[in-house]
């Protein structure tokens, strides 16, 4: 009788450890998928001057890609940097 209790307790302990370990691995895989993937797209420069004006560039970026944490940079042209929902598996 005592051996049966020890065996049952051992099996139960191993099962609980297995469930906890597989749950941790599942959480790590989900966290890995949640990493942000950034995209960059060029936009047209200022029509009159042909130069990139950062205020206009930021405004156009926010209008085109709303709610995606957009950022704009001006070098030779206006570039928008935003989170890519289609790469992250979001609609």
From Swiss-Prot:
Example of a GO cellular component annotation carried by this entry: extracellular region
Keyword Glycoprotein: yes
InterPro entries: DEFL
Cysteines joined through disulfide linkages: 39-84, 52-74, 57-78, 61-80
Sugar-bearing residue positions: 35, 68
Subcellular location per the Swiss-Prot or TrEMBL entry: Secreted
Record bears the keyword Secreted: yes
Family: Belongs to the DEFL family.
Protein name stated in the entry: Putative defensin-like protein 145
Organism (species): Arabidopsis thaliana (Mouse-ear cress)
Top-level taxonomy: Eukaryota, Viridiplantae, Streptophyta, Embryophyta, Tracheophyta
């Amino acid at each position: 009788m005592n051996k049966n209790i020890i065996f049952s307790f051992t099996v139960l302990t191993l099962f609980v450890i297995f469930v906890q370990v597989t749950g941790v691995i599942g959480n790590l895989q989900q966290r890995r998928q949640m990493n942000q993937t950034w995209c960059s797209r060029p936009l047209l420069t200022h029509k009159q001057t042909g130069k990139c004006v950062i205020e206009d560039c930021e405004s156009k970026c926010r209008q085109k890609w709303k709610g995606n944490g957009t950022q704009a940079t001006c070098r030779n042209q206006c570039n928008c940097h935003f989170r890519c929902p289609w790469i992250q598996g979001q609609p």
